[in-house]
């Protein structure tokens, strides 16, 4: 159609009037085709919305998503964005993430027992990895630095490689509340709105029927003169009665139902892992906990200012959580029990029969394991 031209000549021709007109025509054609396909997709979505229930639509979209995942490029991401669907296959918290947090607690306990038996009371912040571990990954991790050392509260931090941020780790003990009470108060979003004065908004956006993960939107006040921050994150917890341990893992995600608001600063980098080890049982006073935390609050303040805010804010939050647990215990405030017997019974029934698609998460739990969020 066009004569062959050298690249430089072609670029000059496209920059001219005739070339500009051609590019404009191509752009208009692309906009027309894209708009037509988006309208067709919306019409199809409305049709399926009338024909199928919400659970059926989610299952259908899930199958469609799995087919798209094998295609090259960003077709699957684009389709998820256009349809306003949160892709659980990519974002749910996996069993491996929960187990990694529990393993960190075990390593810390093993090393602290060695130190105590040798007459040293300090808890080591970073136990050595087992022999044969990945040496490269160890080299990339910075050493932990003690920030606060009290009898029942120890706080460390370490730089996150390639950033100006720190990761924080707390190892602590409470002896006047039960693990069940402490765990339930931490998970109960409605009760937190009452005891945490910094909360502006806290609600569950979506739940995953497969893993029990939840997506939450949390808006919180930050110290003056900073703007309030908002977090969109997925969380999942697991309670292992056989091994006497409970774990809660959270991390930031993007969700189409919660677009960024100009009123708040969106925190896009956030991770938290809490592991609780009862001294005796879930319903007797006394437990140890390990909290590992990091986030990027998107501030312009120097690194030492941010570190000071987190280092002082973390003990304050944990003490408020502890006091809220005591208040709920002493005043018999009703708090949702996340460690109920019902999920355990359902899990045992599912194990005895062939698991159905709707009960994958129940069938995958052991007879002495509760898992829900």
Swiss-Prot record:
Which compartment or compartments is the protein found in? Mitochondrion
User: What keywords does the record list, in alphabetical order?
Assistant: Coiled coil, Mitochondrion, Transit peptide
Which domain of life does the protein's organism represent? Eukaryota
Gene3D superfamilies registered for this protein in UniProt: 3.30.530.20
Record site: Cleavage: 80-81
Q: What does the record list as coiled-coil region(s)?
A: 89-114
Q: Under which name does UniProt file this protein?
A: StAR-related lipid transfer protein 7, mitochondrial
Please list the GO biological process terms of this entry.
establishment of skin barrier; inflammatory response; mucociliary clearance; myeloid dendritic cell activation; type 2 immune response
Gene Ontology molecular-function annotations: lipid binding; molecular carrier activity
Q: What does this protein do?
A: May play a protective role in mucosal tissues by preventing exaggerated allergic responses.
UniProt PTM: Proteolytically cleaved by PARL.
Q: Which GO terms describe its cellular component?
A: cytoplasm; extracellular region; mitochondrion
Query: Sorted alphabetically, which Pfam families does this protein's record hold?
Result: START
- Locate the region Disordered: 118-141, 347-373
């Amino acid at each position: 159609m066009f004569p062959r031209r050298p690249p430089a000549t072609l670029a000059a021709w496209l920059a001219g009037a005739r070339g500009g007109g051609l590019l404009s025509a191509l752009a208009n054609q692309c906009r027309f085709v894209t708009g037509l396909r988006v309208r067709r997709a919306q019409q199809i979505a409305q049709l399926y919305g009338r024909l199928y229930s919400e659970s059926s639509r989610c299952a259908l979209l899930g199958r469609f998503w799995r087919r798209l995942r094998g295609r090259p490029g960003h077709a699957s991401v684009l389709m998820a964005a256009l349809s306003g669907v949160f892709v659980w296959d990519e974002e749910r918290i996996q069993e491996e993430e929960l187990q990694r947090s529990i393993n960190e607690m075990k390593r810390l306990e093993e090393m602290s027992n060695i130190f105590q038996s040798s007459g040293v009371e300090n808890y080591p912040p970073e136990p050595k990895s087992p022999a044969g571990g990945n040496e490269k990954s160890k080299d990339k991790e910075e050493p932990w630095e003690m920030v606060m050392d009290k009898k029942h509260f120890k706080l460390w931090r370490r730089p996150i490689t390639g950033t100006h941020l720190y990761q924080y780790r707390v190892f602590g003990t409470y002896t006047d509340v039960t693990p069940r009470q402490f765990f339930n108060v931490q998970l109960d979003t409605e009760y937190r709105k009452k005891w945490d004065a910094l909360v502006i908004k806290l609600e569950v956006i979506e739940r995953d029927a497969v893993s029990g993960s939840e997506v939450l939107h949390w808006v919180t006040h930050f110290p003056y003169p900073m703007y309030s921050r908002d977090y969109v994150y997925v969380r999942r917890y697991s309670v292992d009665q056989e091994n006497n341990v409970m774990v809660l893992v959270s991390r930031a995600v993007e969700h189409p139902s919660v677009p960024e608001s100009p009123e708040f600063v969106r925190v896009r980098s956030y991770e938290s892992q809490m592991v609780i080890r009862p001294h005796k049982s879930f319903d007797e006073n006394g437990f140890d906990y390990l909290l590992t935390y990091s986030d990027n609050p998107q501030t312009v303040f120097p690194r030492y200012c941010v570190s000071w805010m987190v280092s002082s804010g973390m003990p304050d939050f944990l003490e408020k959580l502890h006091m809220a647990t005591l208040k709920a215990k002493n005043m018999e405030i009703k708090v949702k029990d996340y460690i109920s017997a019902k999920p355990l019974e359902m899990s045992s029934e599912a194990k005895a029969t062939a698991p159905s698609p709707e009960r994958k998460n129940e069938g995958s739990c052991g007879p002495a394991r509760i898992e829900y969020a």
